[in-house]
A protein has these predicted regions:
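Molybdopterin (Moco) oxidoreductase catalytic core of the xanthine/aldehyde oxidoreductase family
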Residues: 237-248
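N-terminal export/assembly segments and adjacent metallocofactor-ligating motifs
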Residues: 1-233, 247, 251, 257, ...
Length: 274
């Protein structure tokens, strides 16, 4: 380790993909936020604030471990890397390179994930995946088809301009604390309505102006009922639909056969709440 004196530097929080600015003070051992380009309010969530604690935590692994019977024993880095090389070489020789698979992580940097996939290619396989596929691949595909881009179509600051939020099947109060505490909650306190669709009650529910406790697995009937109410009560933005949305006619024709009360009750929600 270097004996050079360390000074706090502005960096990016490594916990998730929001990209909040973070700086670390070695004297206090605390992490604080700064007004970065993404989170301009300079706030960090408890998870990001605890990022530095992981580095020095007593349970953090700093030495390679290999299995010995029912337990793990420490070995040198040279031994561990040698075992990996020997095992990979044996697998490639016996079953071919496509018997290998590499699983990347969203908690790694872009550079780390890039190096991992280059190692996979060097060994002759394209079997590279990422943990984000389990939770985001369907989102990216659906948003790409419906909105033209598999990512958010607005900035965080745009959230403050909304008159109402519809949060379905998510708990941003705990899952996305920066967005919730810095953007959603202040707006709700200023009069923006928050409609929370979730079978459970949680911190997001407690901040919501309306809670629709949909039965698990019945989101589609609920959303069909909501859509029919919007159409029946003339709440659509016709100018927006005309210039920005395709397939409006087919969409409205589908709802000719949708009965609001039946779908709402199927979803376990009082039709009057819609």
């Amino acid at each position: 380790m270097s004996n050079r004196p360390t000074q706090p530097r502005e960096s990016i929080c490594p916990y998730c993909g929001v990209g909040c600015g973070i700086t670390y003070d070695p004297e206090s051992g605390k992490a604080t936020g700064w007004n970065g380009p993404v989170n301009t309010r300079g706030e960090i969530c408890p998870k990001g604030a605890a990022a530095g604690e992981i580095v020095a935590h007593e349970d953090r692994l700093t030495t390679p471990l290999v299995r010995d019977g029912d337990s793990f024993v420490p070995v040198s880095w040279a031994t561990a890397l040698g075992n990996i090389v020997a095992t990979f070489s044996e697998i490639v020789e016996t079953d071919g390179p496509d018997a290998l698979a590499f699983f990347a992580s969203s908690n790694c940097t872009n550079e780390e994930n890039y190096v991992l996939q280059k190692v996979a290619r060097a060994l002759g396989t394209n079997n590279v995946d990422n943990c984000a596929r389990l939770c985001h691949s369907s989102t990216v595909a659906a948003m790409g088809e419906r909105f033209g881009a598999g990512a958010m179509t607005n900035t965080l600051d745009d959230l403050r301009e909304a008159d109402a939020y519809l949060v379905a099947g998510a708990n941003p109060a705990e899952q996305h604390p920066i967005i919730f505490r810095s953007y959603l909650l202040p707006a709700v306190r200023d009069g923006t309505e928050l409609i929370h669709v979730d079978p459970r009650e949680n911190d997001t529910t407690r901040a919501a102006t309306h809670h629709l406790p949909v039965k698990p697995g019945f989101d589609i009937p609920l959303l069909n009922a909501v859509s029919k109410v919007i159409l029946e009560e003339g709440l659509t933005d016709e100018a927006f639909l005309e210039t920005r949305v395709d397939g409006v006619e087919a969409f409205t024709e589908f709802f000719d056969s949708v009965v609001v009360d039946d779908n709402a009750r199927l979803a376990g929600v009082d039709p009057a709440d819609l």
